[in-house]
Regions:
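N-terminal helix-turn-helix DNA-binding core of bacterial DNA-binding proteins
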Residues: 16-59
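N-terminal leader segment of winged-helix/HTH proteins
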Residues: 1-25, 72, 141
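Charged, amphipathic alpha-helical coiled-coil/dimerization segments
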Residues: 15, 65-128
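Short, locally clustered residues in the helix-turn-helix/winged-helix DNA-binding domain
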Residues: 8, 36-40, 101, 128
Length: 142
């Protein structure tokens, strides 16, 4: 039960911490990863986000709509498939993305504080394996 407890504690408090750091930029812990990906891959298909982030499709639709409403991204129809959209960052998003990336890097450093580089690598390997174990059990393959 200790593993579940500390996964829960870490998840809850890193999100609170990240929300405080991201607040001046008008985004939160559920939006930053989408914004980073869209800024780094302009024209990315909305549907491709599903395979990257292991979230429910409704979360993607809601987050994309919120980012668009906030003036962070624009949507453009996909000429090859009208059922999906291409996503592009706005100038506003591009002007803050480096700071957001830095906040994420500092948050990761905080979480890994006190671990050697080899311990950090092992921790990441173990965390990835745990994630694969649970997604495989739930038959979520990406």
């Amino acid at each position: 039960m200790q593993l579940l407890k500390w996964l829960s504690v870490t998840d809850r408090f890193y999100k609170i911490y990240l929300d405080k750091q991201l607040a001046p930029y008008g985004i939160n812990n559920s939006q930053y990863m989408f914004l980073i990906k869209i800024c780094r891959s302009p024209g990315i298909l909305q549907d491709s986000l599903l395979n990257m982030f292991y979230v429910h499709p409704s979360n993607i639709v809601r987050t994309v709509a919120t980012l668009e409403k906030q003036g962070m991204i624009t949507r453009s129809p996909n000429d090859k498939d009208k059922r999906t959209c291409k996503l592009y960052p706005t100038e506003r998003a591009l002007s803050i993305i480096d700071e957001i990336q830095m906040i994420c890097e500092k948050t990761e450093a905080l979480l890994l504080q006190g671990m050697s580089e080899s311990e950090q690598n092992l921790f990441m390997d173990f965390l990835i394996q745990a994630g694969r174990n649970i997604t495989s059990e739930l038959h979520i393959e990406r």
